[in-house]
């Protein structure tokens, strides 16, 4: 397994009002990932996630897929150094 990393993601498309953040929260918890998913005013969702690199890539697969009612059109991803600032994965 790779080392600990931070992943910052902005997801565009039909991702608000369709259970998207909860979907990501469930998958993050299963993968042992900490951080948050937050709705942004422009209709996109911001995700900040920390965990093992392999787990983050598995979460990224779910981020791109989304729940059944969502339609992910674009995903911007940036990796950075792990900070350890989160104790859980929350939604806002």
From Swiss-Prot:
Q: Which InterPro entries match?
A: Acylphosphatase (IPR020456), Acylphosphatase-like_dom (IPR001792), Acylphosphatase-like_dom_sf (IPR036046), Acylphosphatase_CS (IPR017968)
Similarity comment: Belongs to the acylphosphatase family.
UniProt name for this protein:
Acylphosphatase
According to its UniProt record, the EC number is 3.6.1.7
UniProt entry tagged with the keyword Ligase: no
- Which keywords annotate this record? Hydrolase
Where the record annotates domain Acylphosphatase-like, the positions are 6-92
List the GO molecular function terms: acylphosphatase activity
Where is the secretion signal located? Answer: none
Its recorded reaction(s) are: an acyl phosphate + H2O = a carboxylate + phosphate + H(+)
Q: Which domain of life is it from?
A: Archaea
Return the Gene3D superfamilies for the record: 3.30.70.100
Q: What is the lineage of its organism?
A: Archaea, Thermoproteota, Thermoprotei, Sulfolobales, Sulfolobaceae
Active site: which residues? 21, 39
């Amino acid at each position: 397994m790779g080392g600990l990393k931070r992943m910052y993601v902005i997801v565009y498309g039909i991702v608000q009002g369709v259970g998207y953040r909860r979907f990501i929260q469930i998958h993050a918890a299963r993968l042992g990932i900490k951080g948050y998913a937050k709705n942004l005013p422009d209709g996109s969702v911001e995700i900040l996630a920390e965990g093992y690199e392999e787990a983050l890539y598995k979460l990224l697969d779910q981020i791109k897929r989304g729940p059944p009612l969502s339609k992910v059109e674009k995903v911007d991803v940036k990796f950075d150094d792990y900070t350890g600032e989160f104790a859980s994965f929350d939604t806002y």
